[in-house]
């Protein structure tokens, strides 16, 4: 059963709330129970008008929007769209807002179909969460124009040419800082080693020879480090002063890494100034503290992730796979305790065995389960070798289980990044009807290069083709559909 012909006039005045048509009292029940036929590329679906009117802001729920696709000759709505996807679209109206992607429809095609039918954003966000997708959060920008320009320069390198130049300078300074951090540990450059100190730096107190530490301010590595810190501090302050939200700024992990990259220098500087008035034993203690603090400088390498898409994808993959990684560590912990205990009791009768205790066997169990096998500890008895074989096999199986999930997450983030890059390069022509506003009904066939269905019923319907699916003004996302 199809809708009556008077629906053409009635639908222009039927504007529905969320779950009820605004029908007249006399014929409300009759109109709300009317059935409508929807033709999707030759496959007909039949439903009630009140089912579609549950979501009046969507394409099918708004009578004026769907009127553009009404075929008065066949008394149906025609959409040249993907047919398998419409099962889920119609179920969205029937279930009151539930979206379930068909198994034979890819994610990109189903996302295009939801966009075409103007499904509500809240339902799309819930669908993305159910599919395990990360919802893109709109980037906040400062209200002040000058702050906005500074924020774009230092936070988004792809925004302009000067921003790319600043990113190149920042990456260069990071690389120089990491190289200096590594070179200063070479024996020929380590001035804090007593063998390399000149005689003038040795003095004797109460028969004990003390080594006077060279002046840090004359160290060329310290000078280069100072120049790098000047740039890091300038970059950090500019980004902090121009950020749109100060609390959100400190919650960002990358900004915490920036603080860790800058703080060791100032702590080192403070300890160096304090050491000049301390005794020799206190200097040795300060030197030990200083070495621990300098170790934090290695975290500067993570500053490169701000300018590297690959490191960002890796970080997103690890964050999305945190539950799988936790499960992997838990399984490894169980295996380490189990096999270290087994190998200890298997090797207990051998006096030359290196497994003196169960905690001492933890190291062997870890390197065996991870298939590293250093060989510094190995079983010598038959029982110990059997336990070692089982430990290696169990380690391979334990590590292999969560790997496909982690690889799947990496592929998702990698392909999403590639799609975002393609979106910025290519232009898009959709494969369905033009998604114009419902108020555009004037004759624009010459400018839009389209043919509209003739209202003259004497013409042959086969010669009046409606080509409303061509839109040269949208952007191509690199995605294909099967319609």
Curated annotation (Swiss-Prot):
Phosphothreonine, modified sites: 430
InterPro entries the record matches: BTB/POZ_dom, Ion_trans_dom, K_chnl_volt-dep_Kv, K_chnl_volt-dep_Kv1, SKP1/BTB/POZ_sf, T1-type_BTB, VG_K_chnl, Volt_channel_dom_sf
Keywords carried by this UniProt record: Ion channel, Ion transport, Lipoprotein, Membrane, Palmitate, Phosphoprotein, Potassium, Potassium channel, Potassium transport, Transmembrane, Transmembrane helix, Transport, Voltage-gated channel
Record lipid sites (S-palmitoyl cysteine): 243
Gene Ontology molecular functions: delayed rectifier potassium channel activity; voltage-gated potassium channel activity
Tissue expression remark: Expressed in oligodendrocytes and astrocytes.
UniProt keyword Transmembrane, yes or no: yes
Entry coiled-coil feature ranges: none
Polar residues biased stretches: 440-452
TM ranges: 166-186, 221-241, 253-273, 325-345, 354-374, 386-406
Record topological domains on the Extracellular side: 187-220, 274-324, 375-385
GO cellular-component term (any): voltage-gated potassium channel complex
Sequence positions bearing Phosphotyrosine: 426
Compartments, record wording: Membrane
Motif Selectivity filter boundaries: 371-376
Protein name according to UniProt: Shaker-related potassium channel tsha2
SMART domains documented for this protein: BTB
Oligomeric form and interacting partners: Heterotetramer of potassium channel proteins. Binds PDZ domains of dlg1, dlg2 and dlg4.
């Amino acid at each position: 059963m199809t809708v009556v012909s008077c629906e053409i006039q009635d639908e222009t005045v039927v504007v529905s709330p969320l779950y009820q048509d605004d029908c007249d009292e006399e014929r409300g029940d009759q109109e709300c129970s009317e059935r409508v036929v929807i033709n999707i590329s030759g496959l007909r679906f039949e439903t009630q008008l009140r089912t579609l009117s549950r979501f009046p802001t969507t394409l099918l729920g708004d009578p004026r929007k769907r009127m553009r696709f009404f075929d008065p000759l066949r008394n149906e709505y025609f959409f040249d769209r993907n047919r398998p996807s419409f099962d889920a679209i119609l179920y969205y109206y029937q279930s009151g807002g539930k979206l379930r992607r068909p198994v034979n429809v890819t994610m990109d095609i189903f996302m295009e179909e939801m966009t075409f039918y103007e499904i509500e954003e809240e339902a799309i966000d819930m669908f993305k969460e159910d599919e395990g997708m990360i919802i893109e959060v709109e980037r906040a920008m400062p209200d002040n124009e000058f702050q906005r320009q500074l924020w774009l320069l230092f936070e988004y390198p792809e925004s302009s040419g000067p921003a790319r130049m600043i990113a190149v300078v920042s990456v260069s300074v990071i690389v120089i800082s990491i190289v200096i951090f590594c070179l200063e540990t070479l024996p020929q450059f380590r001035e804090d080693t007593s063998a390399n100190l000149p005689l003038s730096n040795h003095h004797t107190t109460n028969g004990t020879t003390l080594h006077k530490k060279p002046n840090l301010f004359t160290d060329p590595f310290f000078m280069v480090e100072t120049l790098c810190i000047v740039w890091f501090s300038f970059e950090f302050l500019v980004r902090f002063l121009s950020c749109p939200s100060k609390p959100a700024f400190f919650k960002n992990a990358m900004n915490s890494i920036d603080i860790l990259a800058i703080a060791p220098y100032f702590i080192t500087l403070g300890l160096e100034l304090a050491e000049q008035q301390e005794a020799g034993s206190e200097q040795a203690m300060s030197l030990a503290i200083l070495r621990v603090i300098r170790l934090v400088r290695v975290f500067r390498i993570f500053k490169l992730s701000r300018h590297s898409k690959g490191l960002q994808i890796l970080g997103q993959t690890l964050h999305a796979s945190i539950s799988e990684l936790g499960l992997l560590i838990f399984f490894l912990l169980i295996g380490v305790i189990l096999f270290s205990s087994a190998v200890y009791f298997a090797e207990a009768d051998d006096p030359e065995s290196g497994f003196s205790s169960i905690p001492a066997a933890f190291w062997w169990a870890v390197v065996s389960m991870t298939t590293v096998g250093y060989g510094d500890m190995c079983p010598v008895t038959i029982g110990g070798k059997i336990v070692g074989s089982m430990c290696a096999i169990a380690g391979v199986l334990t590590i292999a289980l969560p790997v496909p999930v982690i690889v799947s997450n990496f592929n998702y983030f990698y392909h999403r990044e590639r799609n975002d890059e393609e979106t910025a390069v290519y232009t898009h022509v959709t494969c369905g009807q033009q998604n114009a506003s419902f108020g555009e009904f004037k004759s624009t066939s010459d400018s839009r290069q389209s043919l509209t269905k003739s209202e003259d019923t004497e013409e042959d319907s086969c010669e009046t083709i409606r080509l409303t699916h061509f839109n040269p003004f949208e952007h191509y996302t690199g995605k294909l559909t099967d319609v």
